[in-house]
Amino acid sequence: MNRNRHIRRGYHPEAGERQIIDSLFAATHSDPFAYLGRHRVNDEREAVRVLRPDAHHIDIIDRHTGAVIMPSEKIDERGLFAAVLPEHAPDYALLVTYHEGEAAVREEDDYRFGSALQHTDAWLLGEGTHLRPYETLGAHFAEMDGVSGVRFAVWAPNARRVSVIGEFNGWDSRRHAMRPHTGNGLWDIFIPGVGLNALYKFSVLDANGNIREKADPYAFGAELRPTTASVVRGLPAKAEAPAFRRRANSVEAPISIYEVHLGSWRRNPENNYWLTYTQLADELVNYVKDMGFTHIELLPLSEYPFDGSWGYQATGLYAPTSRFGSPDELKALIDAAHAAGISVILDWVAGHFPTDDHGLNTFDGTALYEHADPREGYHQDWNTLIYNFGRNEVKNFLQGNALYWIERFGFDGIRVDAVASMIYRNYSRKDGEWIPNRYGGSENLEAIAFLRQTNAVLKSETPGAGSFAEESTSFADVTREAGLNFDFKWNMGWMNDTLRYMQEDPVHRKYHHGKMTFGMMYQYSENFVLPLSHDEVVHGKRSLLGKMPGDCWQQFANLRAYYGFMYGFPGKKLLFMGNEFAQGREWNYQEGLDWHLLDEAGGWHKGVQDYVRDLNHIYTAHAPLYQLDQQPEGFEWLVADDSDNSVFVFERRDRAGNRIIVISNFTPVVREHYRFGVNAPGRYTEILNSDRTQYQGSGIANGADITAENVPSHGKAQSLSLTLPPLATVYLYQKAAPATEIQTALRADKQPAVKDKQAKAK
């Protein structure tokens, strides 16, 4: 037996170690794992080196028995300890004395653990095909070698050194420098003992030698402004998709969306502070259910530093904002909506990100997530940076985020913001301010491919989840697989045209008649949503009510008539919060809506609210208003050219042959004996009239039932004669009759000349 085997041998730094040690304390060493921890030294013995700048003494102990294997030597007064281990020394831990005379603390050596990164993950990230990179990158609770802690991983290919800094190490970048993975730009480290809600950042020694303290791009939690640290949180459990998701997002389903900014929908009256997710799960969900909306669309909920961005400039894309509560409470809000039969859409910002120092901006000293050239990478209108959609790791980051919100929180779809700014290189740029694509065109080919692929991934991985595009140009095939592959596109053209028409004085509307009909010229080119969104009630544009001309009565009547026209027109519906009760002032994100208006004398606002509630319930209960939105068989103009009277009449149909005739009179003149042709004989029932007194209208109506007469009109053998209320929209419903009833009606009216196609359809 070698009697000298367990005799302590002093650690003698080699000549070249001084430079290494200095770089460790300067936090400039690119790979501390190559030096710290357990390593063989020149005489083929093993040594343990530990960097603890605040420690007084460290013993190397048997991690199983706690027995001291070897006391260490302090080989640098700044706090570097080393011990040469005896042969066949067991696995070790540390017994650290921080102050002389105090009790020692058992700790793990962070540099004794291997990497948790898998080669497959790194390969998929580099290829741009890692569907769920958030399961690998970021901060994740883990157990390694029986020790609990958190594994951290980040992508920073051009960094010289990356460290995890946080509460657990005094924000000291020397303590937890990460392991570099040459070739893929990844860095990782496992830190034992880090707990839930610990604050952290990445300290990045960038490509230019500058220190940048960055929030974790993949963090599941983040501090509320003004502080900017990431928060260690567990990966949310997968959410169960509601059984009705696929049906609710179908192009043949009734979709009526209530767009909500959670911070200003309603506030606590005592302190004007935000409602919590828990309060909203009760108050918002019950309100939306009562009002008859089918979907809630939430403005962006990724953590953002500037309240005035409304969430559209996020720095923590994977971190639900803590303004309103915890991630679990957000999931409970979505669950409450699902329990009420309501789908929830998340406003998702994938086009740009803010320039905040702690965010993605020049993350490792280079344009990592953005383009280096400002002609490609800088958005002049919003002072934000544009994602580099041609970079695989960036595509992974964004596509994974879309999946994350749907799979982990239960959102039923995403609405992608500012798509036009993504797909055009010259968006809001003058000549000379943009770079053409490889073919010389203005399209951003990489962004187009990214959107198409992201939507394909959603369709494959989250069946039934919807994707909605806010796209403001005439870019073709937004909702076609060969195009951008969205499910729906916001019809910004319809919104702009019809609002311009409605802002005209009724006496002038006859000169702008085509603005209300033009939408049908391209209706079947895309699957459309008709949006009256937050963008239309801010920045001096006035509220929807404020846009309406005339005195008080006329303003409210105009708005009710317009809503009726909108709900009858083909396309899914969207109203921003406050529009449903005609809020008079513009939206202010710093205050709750003016709910007190519902209690005002006169009942104007309450009348609009009651009207929208009835509109929603009528819309969802009658298939002619939604089933064939995207098929020509579901729509027919009956009167499209009566510009002198500013009257529009059209028919909506479903597959069963049920009909709803929509009549809108956009003048304050009562039109008596107004006649128009109809396709089917028989009785029609008035199911909606925006001029009813319960809505604060004038009460002009036609009775419950109206019968078609044997009077030709507008090229039809049958016609109706009505009194049209002023500034009003009326819906007439006719249920499809059995063929025998149709034949009887035809004989009674002596009208055999009904088209064979119609007769067969019935």
From Swiss-Prot:
Disulfide bonds: none annotated. It comes from the Bacteria. Keywords: Carbohydrate metabolism, Glycogen biosynthesis, Glycogen metabolism, Glycosyltransferase, Transferase. The active site is at residues 417, 470. It holds the Pfam family Alpha-amylase. Pathway: Glycan biosynthesis; glycogen biosynthesis. GO terms for biological process: glycogen biosynthetic process. It is an enzyme of class 2 (transferase). InterPro entries: A-amylase/branching_C (IPR006048), Branching_enzy (IPR037439), GlgB (IPR006407), GlgB_N (IPR054169), GlgB_N_E_set_prok (IPR044143), Glyco_hydro_13_cat_dom (IPR006047), Glyco_hydro_13_N (IPR004193), Glyco_hydro_b (IPR013780). Its EC number is 2.4.1.18. Gene3D superfamilies: Glycosidases, Golgi alpha-mannosidase II, Immunoglobulins. One of its GO terms (molecular function) is 1,4-alpha-glucan branching enzyme activity. Belongs to the glycosyl hydrolase 13 family. GlgB subfamily. Catalyzes the formation of the alpha-1,6-glucosidic linkages in glycogen by scission of a 1,4-alpha-linked oligosaccharide from growing alpha-1,4-glucan chains and the subsequent attachment of the oligosaccharide to the alpha-1,6 position. This is 1,4-alpha-glucan branching enzyme GlgB. The gene is glgB.
